[in-house]
Amino acid sequence: MPTSLRQAATTMFEERSWLCIPLRKDTNGLAKVPISQGWTSLEPSLKTVESLPWEQAEGLGIVLGEKSNSLAVLDVDDEALAQAIMLYCWDRLDTSPRLVSTARNRLHIYFQEIDYPSPSSKQIVKFDGREVTVELKANGTQVA
């Protein structure tokens, strides 16, 4: 597994300029915690990606914001709301965003910020009579 994670990280950097880091499991057994100290200050380069401790990795994280070509993620904790957001966006975007189902059965919507990387933020919204958390994960954070 570690070799394939290293290769996936290398490919993502070469093809998309996304800086990926190795992750270890958290207390819930999910690979979400960066192995490397100082991952927020890593220089985005192929040499950096290849030098990380992938042999210890139990998962792969993507560093968001300026380190990864202004990549950001909308983390939606409700499937119905995520679908509504996607339908709204598909009518207004030039390309379809990438969707990823998370380890906790939530949805990540990946997109590239156009002007500059934003800080992360979190909102509780009402949707279909219930409260739902929607989080913009952006500059200085990572997603698994």
Question: Each predicted region: which residue ranges?
Answer:
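Conserved phosphate/metal-binding and DNA-contacting active-site motifs used
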Residues: 1-144
